Amino acid sequence: MAGIKALISLSFGGAIGLMFLMLGCALPIYNQYWPLFVLFFYILSPIPYCIARRLVDDTDAMSNACKELAIFLTTGIVVSAFGLPVVFARAHLIEWGACALVLTGNTVIFATILGFFLVFGSNDDFSWQQW
């Protein structure tokens, strides 16, 4: 039952984060859809860590370096997702209010992604690795 509650709360967090992103795009005072490019970063962010978890053993000495590289790449993707709206706002493609809404959505979405890996990342029967 705890897994179901975690799944519901993670889906609620994802919906709230996407709501902030869409508010930053679709409100009539902003009306620019450039911030939707951060969706690519949402999709790309878990990929390096998922690949590293699949390819290496925990007993291998190389596994630590591979996981650290995956975490480094994931960090670069997350920092890019936070930097892109700021670059758009500095280039006057979007308003600063839209930038704030997108950054709030980024925080919620990446916290949701982190929560997913913390809840479902163990090697038990209720693991995301079986999906």
UniProtKB/Swiss-Prot annotation:
Keywords: Membrane, Transmembrane, Transmembrane helix
Protein name (Swiss-Prot/TrEMBL): Leptin receptor overlapping transcript-like 1
UniProt topology in membrane: Multi-pass membrane protein
Subcellular location: Membrane
Reported induction: Up-regulated in the liver of fasting animals.
Description of how the protein assembles with itself and partners: Interacts with RAB13.
Similarity comment text for this entry: Belongs to the OB-RGRP/VPS55 family.
Lineage: Eukaryota, Metazoa, Chordata, Craniata, Vertebrata
Any one GO molecular function term: identical protein binding
Chief localisation class: membrane
Any one cellular-component term (Gene Ontology): membrane
Organism expressing this protein natively: Mus musculus (Mouse)
Purpose: Negatively regulates growth hormone (GH) receptor cell surface expression in liver. May play a role in liver resistance to GH during periods of reduced nutrient availability.
TM regions (residue ranges): 7-27, 32-52, 69-89, 100-120
